[in-house]
Amino acid sequence: MEEESKSLPSKDNFSEWYNELLMTAQIMDVRYPIKGVYVWYPFGFSIRKKVYNMLRNLLDVDHQETYFPMLIPKPELLKESEHIKGFEDEVYWVTHGGLSELEVPLALRPTSETAIYPMYKLWIRSHADLPLKLYQIVNTFRYETKHTRPLIRLREITSFKEAHTAHATWDDAEKQVHEAMDLYSEFFTKLAVPFIVHKRPEWDKFPGADYTMAFDTMMPDGKSLQVGTVHHLGTKFAKTYDITYEDEKGERQYVNQTCYGISERCIAAVIGIHGDNKGLVLPPNASQTQVVIIPIIFKKDDGGVKEACQKVKELLRANDIVAVIDDADERPGAKYYKWEMKGTPFRIEIGPRDIKNNSVMLVRRDGKKESIPMDGLPETVRNKLFEFQTDLLNAARDSMLARVKACETLDEAKQQIENGWATMPWCGEKACGLEMENAVNCKLLGEAHTIKGAGKCPICGKATDRIITMARSY
Ligand SMILES: Nc1ncnc2c1ncn2[C@@H]1O[C@H](COS(=O)(=O)NC(=O)[C@@H](N)CS)[C@@H](O)[C@H]1O
């Protein structure tokens, strides 16, 4: 495919840089003729594949993967009133089969509670069937009216991982909420994406949920990106869909449920947070290729360089490190540019001098360059890969936390969210919360366990130790 050789705009203009990079690095093609619907380039899809395989491996420890229908009959979708209130203006409808109008309109799943839970009713009979922990990775459809953007706000969400669990008691479901949060923490840590977990305010929780825990990360423009959510659903859906089980005493009880979702926003976060003016910077767990080997040949006789490259590639692959040799007939500099644009974590340069010293030149994507001996090469490279992932995460976390600031007044908060997040005391009343959102023109992300403090609610003046985070959001 034709590589776009255009240079990137500066990352200081994040939105322009982000859009240009998605095309130049061949992640997603935004030219599909439906708003909010985009096309994966094969390279972008290789990132998705790597990232979602990692997510599957984490889930498959104690979940089972399955697949539910995309089409949902209107009566099923409308059953849970709070849920449908939250989604009715986002649902796409299928009204015809060929030339004939359908008797019952069918919704394209915006999320799959209303497709799955009628089946859970049929599948769950006794406490022995619990806990039931299933997930699927599917496309979902939401008629988003806010600004659509590839990987961030799509109308066809192409990589929607949704897990749906059922438990005997509210506490068991609460335990599952925490297990899901631990799994998400591990997943985002492996992607070197820092996050703060906020409990969403009552008025912004998932429609039909008891409460919502959200994983929020900060994009370079200071806006928050909700990259994952975990919802405690209590018995609301169980009562609506009559999902009951027979307990040990033979009595019928409603199940308690949770659901938790991650979409391709996790990839938007990796690209946005770690990328630089030369292109993508991919943590090893997000990149199909971890090391590209570049032969440095000056004259006809390559002095054994080609052979050495082959040996290094085989050595690394034998140790589960994905290495490729770029032996195209191109100047090394042109190769560096190409692989840096694609965000490959490491480059190994091998020239006659390296052969003589029995070493290779290891260049880390962020520029760190060092000569390492051939002896123990795979072990050294593996350690360097892990070091890179840790350095990326620490740098991103430090930069995010440096931009979260405790503010005394709403004016100060308004100023602060121009380029970061503000935290302020909040009495917990919805009226005050909504007034804070209006005054600062932002979203209240909610309260975070990790953010402590005390003060007076800026609206009603009541003393409180509840601290809330405010941010501009995607
Ligand atoms: N239009 C969208 N484009 C891309 N990602 C989205 C979009 N809408 C939501 N998401 C992502 O999908 C995650 C789950 O969506 S959700 O509405 O919060 N939760 C659910 O749908 C629940 N059924 C859990 S799967 C969100 O946390 C967000 O990261």
UniProtKB/Swiss-Prot annotation:
Biological processes per GO annotation: prolyl-tRNA aminoacylation
Compartmental location: Cytoplasm
Annotated EC: 6.1.1.15
GO molecular function terms noted in the UniProt entry: ATP binding; proline-tRNA ligase activity
Reactions catalysed: tRNA(Pro) + L-proline + ATP = L-prolyl-tRNA(Pro) + AMP + diphosphate
Subunit structure: Homodimer.
Free-text note regarding domains: Consists of three domains: the N-terminal catalytic domain, the anticodon-binding domain and the C-terminal extension.
Protein's job: Catalyzes the attachment of proline to tRNA(Pro) in a two-step reaction: proline is first activated by ATP to form Pro-AMP and then transferred to the acceptor end of tRNA(Pro).
PANTHER family assigned: BIFUNCTIONAL GLUTAMATE_PROLINE--TRNA LIGASE, PROLYL-TRNA SYNTHETASE
HAMAP family reported for this sequence: Pro_tRNA_synth_type3
Protein's UniProt name: Proline--tRNA ligase
